[in-house]
Amino acid sequence: MENKVKTVAVFSGYYLPFLGGIERYTDKMTADLVKRGYRVVIVTTNHGDLPIIDEDKGRKIYRLPTKNIVKQRYPIINKNREYNTLMKYVSDENIDFVICNTRFQLTTLEGLSFAKNHHLPSIVLDHGSSHFSVNNRFLDFFGAIYEHLLTARVKHYRPDFYAVSKRSVEWLKHFNIEAKGVIYNSVSESLGSDFAGTAYLEKSADDIFITYAGRIIKEKGIELLLEAFSMSQYSENVYLQIAGDGPELAHLKEKYQSKQINFLGKLNFEQTMSLMAQTDIFVYPSMYPEGLPTSILEAGLLSSAIIATDRGGTVEVIDSPELGIIMEENTQSLHESLDLLVKDKALREKLQQNIAKRIKEHFTWEKTVEKLDY
């Protein structure tokens, strides 16, 4: 008798073309589930003028309507007639298993409620490592209260909890949650070969590219990088490439004007990876409650030397000075780290080789997604 193809539903606050670490995590995880023979249904929010029902490489996508309030930072689902129709379609997909990304997004409550109503097993994948901060003590205080209240509602459904890093596992204990294990954020094993030799920008043989790729928000530490680069006064063959969009972009472009600093704006995945393939030093100076940053894994597999802060699971990847530099969260530390790698080519190349090898051996979806078999 032929085995029934199992269908997995993934509930996530955002999905592509919204470009962030969790969205790339969802994309790569579900792509590998499809390769392993699963049907995949993604239930997300409609953060723009996108089709409410879509298909992408074997994955069915349902985009729920949202209210217009802060929809680009925290989507609030609008439970109108369109919502009811879409959720009826999801019910008709004959789901076998539910995966919810993050405790903090309201789509997780939707997914867990759906699983309960349909008597389905469910898991929550946590991507955090501390309370979210907007650098305002008053707002952060109430934000932490909100997170505890929301987490209590999530726990009420009794899902199994997993995390994308060991540090995320430890953070869940803050909410009296014992995670079942770690499902590491990962990258495709073929990423290195897919983008080897590609280029997004013109680059001479003696040019050095220092790159940041991510959202342009204060919490990501982007201004630390701009300050550190500007104070270094490097020779004309050293360039800082800033890829990404966000509320701080216009202000930073105005403040940091230099022939050696390029603000590239929002790039698609292929453009970003082609830039990574040209990158000598990738910097991720985040002060954000990360899980395990996707861009560190991508840059590392594409053989960039990495400088990053000790946030989330970063130190589980860069767990030795032979693999990269873990900086302090200040301009001076980043300035010194940049100087070291710009001036020491041998060290830079050694770190590039070592981190690429480590990620290929331990942080690829081909290995990670096996933990989702059920």
Regions found by a protein language model. Name each.
Residues 121, 130-153:
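Nucleotide-sugar donor phosphate/pyrophosphate-binding loop at the beta->alpha transition
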Residues 148-181, 187-191, 251:
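A short, active-site helix/loop in glycosyltransferases that binds the activated sugar's phosphate group
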Residues 162, 187, 202-220, 226-230, ...:
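Conserved donor-binding/catalytic core segment of Leloir-type glycosyltransferases
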Residues 250-270:
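Nucleotide-activated donor-binding/catalytic signature segment of Leloir-type glycosyltransferases, i.e.
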Residues 266-267, 274-279:
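Short alpha-helical donor nucleotide-sugar binding micro-motif in glycosyltransferases
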Residues 277-291, 304:
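Acidic donor-binding loop of glycosyltransferase active sites
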Residues 296, 305-308:
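Short hydrophobic beta-strand element within catalytic cores of glycosyltransferases
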Residues 320-332, 340-346:
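Conserved acidic donor-binding segment of nucleotide-sugar-dependent glycosyltransferases
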